[in-house]
Amino acid sequence: MLHSYSEYVDEGMSMKKDSKTAEAFANSWNNLPLGSVYSDKQVQDWLLPLKEKDFKNKRILELGCGNGSFLLHIINWEPLYLEGVDLGDSVISAKKNLEITQKNWDIIQADLTEYKGTNFDIVYCIGVLHHLKDPKKGFDAVIKNVKKNGIFHCWVYGKEGNALIIYFVDPLRKICCMLPWWYTKYCIATPLAILFLIYANLVAKFSFIKLTKLFPLYEYCLWISQREFSFFVHVSFDQLVTPQTNYIPKSTIQSWLRSCEYLEDWYIIQRNGNSWKFGGALRNDTIYRLQLLIR
């Protein structure tokens, strides 16, 4: 069985244009307890329309794996081989998390925008492209790692539905990303998480009133109100710790997909009213072709 932690030899690793973002998220991931911050239900939701059965006996690649929170769930879906790539030192936590299993996996420290593996049936990238200096380059990396007849799936923050975040939270992020991670997490993100917890739960409680549907982040509030407080803190900290965040409109995603020469089928699905899931199949086989949901 393969269990390892590898590093692409690259003398310029610390000079990569996304290295500051990778370092910020490594500070976030490496200061969490071992284990996944997500439930299996959350992981399944992020990956839909892909399902657990799609991963069985397949070679899987995650670009931007963080501490391995997604990998910890997918390893139980019986993939043939599972690989995670991340630029930051969060790969240390990912390796520790994956060491509990005796299955085939590898964790690689590398710039995902330049990484090229081999023969992956499914490549996914969750919550990473929007933090890159060049999100399109990240998308291109996803595509180039999918083998012929393979599948890819991504999730990004949307420009649509995020006005509150873009105009009020993002300016705060530009300040917080320069502060020590512990100060941002405990002195800023945690108090904001308390306020958002109250807001989200009030929106959910009174969702039977039609007027609440006009409130900012309505659909997102219905989703996150079901989560524990620690997840609110995790989300708030993630929003504030990074030096780079892009909010990507649907039209941009459409242009990415249409520029993909070998793409047979593709889909774009709005998630919780403020983000986009999208992906497709680089193949011709109608038996395994993805169902087109939204185009």
Regions found by a protein language model. Give the residues of each.
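A SAM-dependent methyltransferase catalytic signature shared across enzymes that methylate proteins
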Residues: 254-268
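Conserved class I S-adenosyl-L-methionine
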Residues: 151-190
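Catalytic cores of eukaryotic secretory-pathway lumenal/extracellular enzymes that build
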Residues: 90, 135-139, 156-158, 165
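Conserved N-terminal segment of class I S-adenosyl-L-methionine
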Residues: 1-61, 65-118, 122, 246, ...
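Active-site micro-motifs of SAM-dependent methyltransferase domains
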Residues: 114, 130, 159
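A short SAM/SAH-binding and catalytic strip from SAM-dependent methyltransferases
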Residues: 122-133
